[in-house]
A protein has these predicted regions:
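Sec-dependent N-terminal signal peptides
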Residues: 4-14
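Lipid interaction determinants
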Residues: 18-134
Length: 134
């Protein structure tokens, strides 16, 4: 019986470990959005080189893709992100100030605590992924 249980446990553990790794990956071909109200969303975009962009926008996400990119730095907050296991941390800066984010990647959702550096106000948000070309 012990000979059967041990290999079974090893297989189950390996499957759980690999599933969690996949669940902790960012998606780079779209945006993460948090609906602020009926008309506006807070948006994030990540790049494989470690760059992150943050802004607010109307809820028409197809329109967002026309201007929300690295080459348009004047209209967005920019920074670098770091991932450790399922945790993510980044700081973005722009004309409107600096914001710090710290949270967890859960599949296509980012659960983060946001801190505005000027006011020290915090907010907890769950951003949802929307692929490019919805």
């Amino acid at each position: 019986m012990k000979k059967i249980v041990l290999p079974f446990l090893v297989i189950v553990f390996a499957l759980v470990a690999f599933t969690n790794v996949d669940n902790c990956s960012l998606s780079y071909k779209g945006i993460y959005a948090f609906k602020l109200d009926n008309e506006h969303s807070a948006i994030l975009r990540f790049y494989e080189d470690g760059t992150v962009l943050a802004s607010t926008s109307v809820n028409d996400y197809l329109d967002v893709f026309t201007w929300f990119h690295k080459e348009n730095k004047d209209m967005v907050l920019t920074g670098k992100y770091k991932i450790k296991k399922c945790s993510i941390k980044f700081e973005v800066t722009g004309a409107t100030g600096t914001q710090k984010y710290e949270g967890t990647i859960r599949g296509e959702t980012l659960e983060v605590k946001l801190t505005d550096e000027a006011t020290k106000k915090t907010a907890t948000r769950a951003y949802t992924y929307f692929p490019l070309g919805l």
